[in-house]
């Protein structure tokens, strides 16, 4: 206990010193809307895989892409874990980003703490935000806590630190240990006070107790109005302080609709489930791909193949209570699974989807009808097994979305007179007349109309 107490005292002294040096960064307050940082309300998230993003795989090399990402409309950069990776029981050559050996250090493959602080400042100078991936459920197999604080870990039947699932390169943390909890919170505070980040994406958040999250997030928000994203879809997560969660059920239903296994209107059942289960202000991070789905399940090049991707991407960008995600390389697009444990550089060359994403992200930023709390009304425009159409409205702003979620051309009729007129087609860049006259929409087609 003396060793633990000394360790915590040292951490406190370090954090206080850093806090004093970085008080201007930490004390900066941002507006809150619906319980969330205002900047995320009509924002978006772009997941950065530093290892694979450039040939160098460093912070400094990634920084060269900031201008391009800013121009595309990216607002929040989520960096996959930037901590050192354990060498014991390492998987593959480079190991899993999620087997952390030291919570308050930088992966030397990416650079050093000076490089990271410089990158955060560059991102902030571009008007963007930074969140980092955090791994609170488990550590790497040679994390320093294993020797310094063996009581921080769950024990298996042999008395050794336990392994969860097939994650043999990790060791399971024990959340019954309150000293461990305080140490975890102290480590998270380090990144806010020392580097000025704007929040965390928390890995396997669903396996960490809500009581911890309430305590942790409460303390962190006394320092800065941060954004908190949970990997998980349990209702207790937003109730414990998280701003956003993963809508896994919606993602899997999207996959089924894309394969023709379920009708388009099946998406409504998941939306209704979300409305019923979560607090009214809870945000959903909608996506067509992320690092897990790409590496292990062929997203989006396999699950939303070719032209199938676009209408579902529009869906993720325009749904209520949503914050859309774009994963590294989707704007190219990368048409392969990016390895999890080996080097496989993404080549940015054609950027075939960049204009498509820019159009959507620009609309989200400028139009209040895509605020999380803007109204959502389904619209009948034809065959509901194939067509998914809806209107979003807020503060006199209105967006009309039509998606053909099928591999066949469909006939559309807009009966609602309130939608008639000459709205702006954001993808065509022109105003188009809408009436009750029938018209065709191609397979996997999409249209988004902005009423001004």
Predicted regions and their residues:
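Generic enzyme active-site microenvironment
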Residues: 131-132, 201, 229, 287-288, ...
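A structural motif
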Residues: 74, 196-197, 242, 321
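Active-site-proximal helices and loops of the catalytic beta/alpha 8
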Residues: 24-29, 33, 193, 203-287, ...
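Substrate-binding/active-site clefts of carbohydrate-active enzymes
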Residues: 26-46, 51-75, 81-195, 213-222, ...
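Active-site clefts of carbohydrate-active enzymes
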Residues: 279-304
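Bacterial Sec-dependent N-terminal signal peptides
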Residues: 1-25
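Carbohydrate-interacting/catalytic domains
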Residues: 20-42, 46-78, 84, 117, ...
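Short, solvent-exposed turn/loop segments enriched in Gly/Ser/Thr/Pro and often Arg
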Residues: 78-92, 133-142, 203-209, 232-236, ...
């Amino acid at each position: 206990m003396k060793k633990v107490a000394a360790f915590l005292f040292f951490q406190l002294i370090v954090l206080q010193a850093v806090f004093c040096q970085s008080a201007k960064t930490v004390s900066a307050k941002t507006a809150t809307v619906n319980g969330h940082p205002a900047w995320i309300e009509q924002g978006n998230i772009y997941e950065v895989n530093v290892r694979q993003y450039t040939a160098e795989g460093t912070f400094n090399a990634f920084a060269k892409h900031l201008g391009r990402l800013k121009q595309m409309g990216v607002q929040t950069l989520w960096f996959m874990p930037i901590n050192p990776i354990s060498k014991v029981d390492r998987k593959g050559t480079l190991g899993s980003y999620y087997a952390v050996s030291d919570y308050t250090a930088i992966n030397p493959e990416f650079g050093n703490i000076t490089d990271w602080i410089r990158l955060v400042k560059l991102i902030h100078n571009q008007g963007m935000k930074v969140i980092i991936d955090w791994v609170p459920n488990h550590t790497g197999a040679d994390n320093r806590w294993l020797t310094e604080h063996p009581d921080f870990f769950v024990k298996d039947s042999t008395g050794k630190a336990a392994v969860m699932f097939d994650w043999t390169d990790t060791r399971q943390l024990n959340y019954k240990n309150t000293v461990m909890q305080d140490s975890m919170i102290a480590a998270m505070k380090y990144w806010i006070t020392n580097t000025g980040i704007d929040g965390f994406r928390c890995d396997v958040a669903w396996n960490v107790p809500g009581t911890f999250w309430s305590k942790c997030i409460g303390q962190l928000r006394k320092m800065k109005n941060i954004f908190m994203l949970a990997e998980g879809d349990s209702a207790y997560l937003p109730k414990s302080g998280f701003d956003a969660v993963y809508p896994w059920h919606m993602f899997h239903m999207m996959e089924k609709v894309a394969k023709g296994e379920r009708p388009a209107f099946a998406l409504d059942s998941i939306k209704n489930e979300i409305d019923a289960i979560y607090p009214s202000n809870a945000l959903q991070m909608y996506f067509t791909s992320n690092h897990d789905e790409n590496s292990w399940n062929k997203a989006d090049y396999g699950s939303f193949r070719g032209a199938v991707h676009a209408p579902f991407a529009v869906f993720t960008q325009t749904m209520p209570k949503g914050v859309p995600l774009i994963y590294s390389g989707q704007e190219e697009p990368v048409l392969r699974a990016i390895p999890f444990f080996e080097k496989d550089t993404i080549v940015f060359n054609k950027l075939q989807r960049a204009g498509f994403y820019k159009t959507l992200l620009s609309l989200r930023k400028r139009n209040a009808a895509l605020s999380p709390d803007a109204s959502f009304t389904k619209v009948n425009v034809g065959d509901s097994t194939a067509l998914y159409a809806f209107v979003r409205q807020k503060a006199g702003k209105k967006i009309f979305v039509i998606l053909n979620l099928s591999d066949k051309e469909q006939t559309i009729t807009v009966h609602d007179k309130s939608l008639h007129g000459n709205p702006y087609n954001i993808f065509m860049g022109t105003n188009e007349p809408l009436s009750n006259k029938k018209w065709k929409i191609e397979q996997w087609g999409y249209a988004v109309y902005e009423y001004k």
